[in-house]
């Protein structure tokens, strides 16, 4: 489903093809200091010998003809995106994707392409992250779902600079090319749900708070909450925010109060602290904005200031508060 390849310059006496046992080869190279290594390959026996300044190491490979063939591009569409932009867009969304194989469409990142912008979306049905990039111009309007495993591999190898990644895609595969590296992944062949339907449009209650203070408070309070539900309750009254959690079975309870800037009706709403913490950790602005409509509808979390050419929106579904049903 995912293939990564790269090229490098070597000094070779002839052309040869062989499949190398990756783990043994990598472990050997990792254990060597930085020095030239000589490979001697006998294709008829699938034999490989590594030679370093310290000694010789023999291992058996496989016939290169038995190696799975890399899908050819045959791309119907293509566009370029700054490598750093692609990396950050993946990092900002992938943590919010699901793991339920019965809901396969939610296990990846949904990419919507427009002529002059691109949108990345991920959700596990309890939370959602949407990143819009206005500095990407695909020149085509389409969409596809990229699998999580391939995106994690891509993210860990993308350069964090101003270089460009070329993205080619057709109905079944996506092809990423940057530097000497190419990655091919099979697209998730599922229909993505209409995520826009769960984003509340009218959110008259707006809260602005220091992200770090809020994050640390939620971390402390969650220690005392129920470990099954991870629920914390947030009550907003005027310019004061109260965070509360308890585990009735173990008689544990904690409460903290923080100052905030709030406009709207007094409200109490419940959230999953584990999900909230992860979302706050994936924001970088000093302050965040939380927009609310009612205790029974999703909360919108926004950075107080978006970085250039980026619009970021996070959504977290509420949890029912006992006595408010």
Name each region found by the language model.
Residues 1-325:
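Structural preference for solvent-exposed beta-strand-turn elements
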């Amino acid at each position: 489903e995912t293939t990564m390849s790269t090229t490098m310059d070597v000094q070779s006496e002839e052309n040869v093809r062989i499949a190398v046992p990756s783990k043994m080869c990598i472990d050997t190279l990792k254990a060597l200091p930085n020095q030239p290594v000589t490979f001697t390959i006998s294709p008829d026996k699938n034999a490989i010998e590594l030679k370093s300044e310290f000694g010789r190491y023999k291992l058996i490979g496989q016939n290169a003809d038995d190696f799975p063939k890399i899908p050819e591009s045959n791309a119907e569409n293509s566009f370029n995106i700054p490598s750093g932009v692609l990396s950050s867009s993946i990092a900002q969304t992938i943590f919010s994707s699901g793991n339920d194989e019965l809901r396969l469409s939610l296990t990846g990142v949904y990419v919507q392409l427009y002529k002059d912008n691109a949108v990345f979306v991920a959700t596990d049905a309890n939370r959602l992250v949407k990143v819009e990039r206005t500095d990407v111009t695909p020149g085509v309007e389409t969409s596809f779902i990229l699998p999580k495993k391939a995106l994690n591999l891509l993210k860990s190898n993308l350069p964090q600079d101003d270089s460009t990644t070329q993205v080619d895609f057709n109905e079944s595969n996506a092809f990423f090319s940057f530097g000497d590296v190419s990655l091919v992944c099979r697209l998730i062949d599922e229909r993505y749900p209409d995520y826009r339907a769960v984003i509340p449009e009218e959110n008259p209650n707006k809260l602005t708070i220091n992200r770090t203070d809020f994050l640390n408070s939620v971390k402390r309070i969650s220690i005392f909450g129920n470990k099954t539900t991870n629920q914390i309750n947030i009550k907003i009254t005027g310019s004061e925010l109260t965070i509360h959690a308890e585990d009735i079975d173990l008689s544990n309870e904690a409460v903290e109060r923080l100052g905030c800037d709030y406009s709207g009706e007094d409200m109490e709403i419940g959230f999953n602290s584990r999900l909230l913490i992860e979302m706050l950790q994936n924001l970088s602005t000093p302050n965040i904005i939380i927009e609310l409509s009612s205790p029974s509808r999703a909360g919108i979390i926004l950075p107080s200031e978006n970085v250039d050419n980026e619009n970021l929106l996070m959504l977290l579904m509420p949890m029912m508060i006992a006595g408010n049903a």
